[in-house]
Amino acid sequence: GAALAGGVALSAYLLHQHTAPIKAAEPDNRCTKYLDKAYYEGLSDADREVFWQCVRTGIDNPDSGMGCYAMKPGDFTTFKPFFSKVIGDYHKKDPECTLTHVNDWDASGVGEGGVLDLSKLGLKEELSMRVRVGRNLTAFNLPGAMDRAERVAFEKRMLAAFDALTAKFGGSINSITPDFGDGEANPNFIDDAKYKELVDRHIMFKDMDADPYLKSAGISSDWPYGRGCWMSEDSKKIIWFGEEDQLRIMVMKKGFLINEVFSELK
């Protein structure tokens, strides 16, 4: 369907008019599946504006699987009656969304004593393997609500961390942010040819502004400001910044042992 015009929240009546046909035609769209007219109507005007930003991409893009994004960390609490249903549906083992995630980097109980050997599946040639995590900093809005200044501020905030990684692993920062604003040059800026080369090598992400799902959610706004990646000297360790999460931290390697990739990420 065509994208809805303007950024102003729909009335509860119009929301129902737009979502009812999607619910019928696209039952796997979790956003519209759990959008409730009475709940939406009961929100304050201010909360309704934010909630509309959270759910708009699922209405603009009926074939979405999730179709919604929190705009700031607190949205998961503010709009818990909605998000708990969506998240519970996605994580089938926790339909009521009552469990709390606990980080566990111990892989010793997985596979054969922590060894995950893909050659045991009969594979003869080495595979390109990747393990990654997404991270967002609570001091910032989530990507859908960040403006250009905040995206640039986030990039600058990360520079010290990238410098520390470069000292340990070598490498470089590859930024497509044209400038830092107020006449401040970006010392890590790369030209279009270098950017395309990194995309072709699967090291950098593609133009987000061409993605209708991210565009509708506000996640691709201000492209290409605040976007880029840090890459180690051997090109195996990569951190994207400014994509669908503020940070996507990954390790890539050719071989058979996935546990080795996981250990390097850890």
For each of these PLM feature ranges, what is it?
Residues 2-266:
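Long, Pro/Ser/Thr-rich low-complexity/intrinsically disordered regulatory tracts in eukaryotic proteins
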